[in-house]
A protein has these predicted regions:
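Short, acidic, metal-binding catalytic loop of nucleotide-sugar glycosyltransferases
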Residues: 3-18
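Active-site nucleotide-sugar/metal-binding loop of Leloir-type enzymes
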Residues: 53-67
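Short beta-strand-to-loop acidic/aromatic patch adjacent to the donor-nucleotide binding site
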Residues: 64-76
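Conserved donor NDP-sugar-binding/catalytic core segment of glycosyltransferases
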Residues: 80-126
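A recurrent flexible, glycine/aromatic-enriched loop bordering the glycosyltransferase active site
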Residues: 130-156, 204-205
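Donor nucleotide-sugar recognition loop
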Residues: 149-156, 165-182, 187-195
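Active-site donor/metal-binding and catalytic loop motifs
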Residues: 191-208
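Catalytic core of nucleotide-sugar-dependent glycosyltransferases
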Residues: 208-229
Length: 230
């Protein structure tokens, strides 16, 4: 992954010095030097949120960093998704603009898991365009239809670093990106055609602990919110 991004993005003349790749490695150290826009950070094994928050803290120490893209290490995306996101955020007038990438299934790459998600007043989140088949012509109108998004997953989540008001837990808690999105609900979260990531189907990760943590994630904003239940 490091070599691919370095070859196709960091060393390209039009993008050189515009991007930095921060790799937060949870657990055993990886043998890759930092330099030329690549920053390798060996971190304790604190899970996804721990890695993302460590990366966010380190990015904040770099003077010329304005935007950050969170990306899972077990997913994949086209370099074009990064380039489109960069171009869009450069033109955005609102610093609270966030770009979230559409998630598709890695074992069924034309099927959408979600293109952003929507918070309902029961405090559950509902994936937008869930199981839409991107190959079908009849699906294009639905896919192109913009909806008000309340949350974006960390498989591809780009934002202005100066617009962040709260940090997530510095250790793994399933659904941490849900809570992060709720805490920053004033953000204008948008989706873009051509910005996507392929991930493992979440149904393959179901467990008792994950189910508990998912419930906890939606229960917390329900308890602290002034909104009334339906």
């Amino acid at each position: 992954t490091i070599n691919r991004i370095n070859k196709t993005l960091l060393t390209q003349s039009e993008f050189k010095d515009r991007f930095k790749l921060i790799v937060v490695n949870n657990g055993e150290a990886i043998n890759h030097p930092s330099g030329n826009g690549i920053i390798v950070i060996n971190n304790e094994n604190l899970g996804g949120s721990g890695g993302f928050m460590r990366g966010l803290i380190e990015a904040g120490k770099i003077n010329d960093v304005k935007h950050v893209i969170f990306m899972d290490d077990d997913g994949s995306c086209e370099i074009e998704s990064i380039c489109r996101t960069h171009a869009f955020l450069l033109m955005a007038k609102d610093k609270n603009t966030v770009v979230t990438g559409c998630m598709l299934f890695e074992d069924n790459p034309a099927i959408i898991h979600e293109s952003g998600a929507i918070w309902h007043r029961d405090f559950l989140h509902y994936p937008d365009k869930h199981y839409l088949d991107a190959r079908e012509i009849d699906s294009l109108d639905t896919f192109d239809n913009e909806r008000k998004i309340g949350y974006g997953g960390w498989w591809f989540f780009a934002f202005n670093i100066n617009a962040i008001e709260y940090y997530s837990f510095p250790f793994f808690v399933r659904g941490d990106d849900l809570l992060f999105g709720y805490m920053h609900k004033k953000h204008n979260i948008v989706t873009l055609n051509g910005v996507a990531s392929w991930q493992m189907d979440f149904e393959r990760k179901i467990s008792v602990l994950n189910s508990y943590l998912n419930f906890r994630t939606v229960a917390v904003p329900a308890l602290i919110s002034k909104r009334k239940f339906a």
